[in-house]
Amino acid sequence: EGKALVADAHIPNGPYKPAGLENYAYNPNKARRLLREANWDSSIELDMVYYYGDQLTVDLMTAIQAYLADVGVKMNFRRLEGDVGAQLWTGASDPSGPAVVKWDLAYGAHGPLALQEYYSRYETGGISIAPSPADKKLDQMIGVITGTPDVQKQKEGFFNIAKYMQDQLYTYPLYYQQAFIYESDRVNRNGGMYGNPQYNYDWGITNWTTTPDANGKMIMRTNTGPIEFFEHPWFNPGLFIANKVLFDRLITCDGGLAPTRPKMAKHYSLSADGMTLTFIMKENLKWHDGSPLTADDVKWSIETALKVPNLMPNFKTTFSSLKGAENFMNGSASGISGISINGNVLKLNFAKVDPNVLLSFSQFAPLPKKHLKNTDPVKLQQDPYWQKPIGSGPYRVKEVQMNDYLVMVPYDDYHEGRARIDEIIASPSNDNDANLIKNASAKRMDYGFTKNVADVKSLENMNHMNVLPQNIPYTRLIWFQKFRKK
């Protein structure tokens, strides 16, 4: 419908993508021949999972099921619910398996923070979609694109890995999409910028206003509120409204995700060789319970994040590049030696260059050590803290009823000033809200974003809604689970 492009690689069209990639057009005769040559057992039934709640996704699953049946492959599909991240991405402890996840095929999307993240998640020992057995050639290619700040070397590396991944077909890219921000005519950003809505940028939320109601209160209604728990911010740092406004970051970036200025830090500096990053944190930072937010919270958060199973690959690359990270991870050290604290000065010394280190810290939200220090990092998402989290951002939780509503109000002691909108009310949903059009039609939706084309067309027909397309790196794919089953 004019709002998507056919994909022939993970990476979107642009200077980092080579020409002439195989696009694997549908060819049932060739598929049948290859299945015969592979002695495919037609009694096997593949389990395909997805996590979107819209009818278009169900229709797509039904179509894929029919295409597979036509060539002699059985497939059933089901929607994941609950801790979707763990069900999708928990990796096997051994590169030879067995698998921890229960699915064979998964449909979803990847909208990475940095282009390297399209591929770094396939590194041996990583999440569930890493090749099994291990692919050392791929690991070396990942090392090239994640290990140099040299743009030309990165470009050559992306050309090589894009072609190799498409030749090996470890994952099947389907199409590229824009994101569409929607806002009601009640919302005024008052000069705040627009950008990639899946991540955090300097959007000036504290200065937004809405048309006051009959009581003079400014309320903004949105979605992506919690269903069973608040999603932790270390895998999808800006996908959910709570992760955008309940938590804060050391630095911020522009709408294109280029780091621009300090946030919780009052100053930061990266050495010319990229090996030392220094933050001077603001004085009197506070968590929403009034307790101090310190450099020790940041250090603890970095160390804890490295042990969380579903950690954003960009964060993992940055933190594992620190001096002493390897010893910390293998248990031979109690902390990461490359992190040092002197009062409100946090210094990070790296063993190797990470070209996206500032980008990582524009998205990484420290969590309160006080409330989570006794939690097993492997089970971070299951901690009771995520029923009503205490954050550091411009809004705090006032009231929440899981799978019903979330009310957030300004945090009076926020270090960049009290936010002007009196309440943000979020209805429960994942990033694809099945109730979006119903709520928008009833004028109960003021802000959000979507990639659902049918929803975009409906919103564009509502006089009180504005739709603003944003170009983002975002690819819909089918992932293949390659580990042996138990």
Feature annotation, model-predicted:
Residues E1-D8, L34, I44-Q55, T148-L169, ...:
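Alpha-helical secondary-structure segments
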Residues K299, F315-N374:
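Surface-exposed binding/hinge segments that line
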Residues Y182-N200, N223-I241, M264, S291, ...:
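A structural "hinge/loop" feature
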Residues R221-A272, I390-G391:
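N-terminal lobe/hinge region of extracytoplasmic solute-binding protein
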Residues G126, P133, Q177-Q178, T206, ...:
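A bilobed periplasmic-binding-protein/Venus flytrap-type ligand-binding module shared by bacterial periplasmic
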Residues H267-N314, K347, A442:
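Aromatic- and charge-enriched surface segment that lines or borders ligand/interaction sites
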Residues E1-A19, Y52-A66, T90-P226, G238-K244, ...:
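Detector for C-terminal structural segments
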Residues K74, D383-W386, Y411-S458, P473:
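Ligand-site clamp/hinge motif
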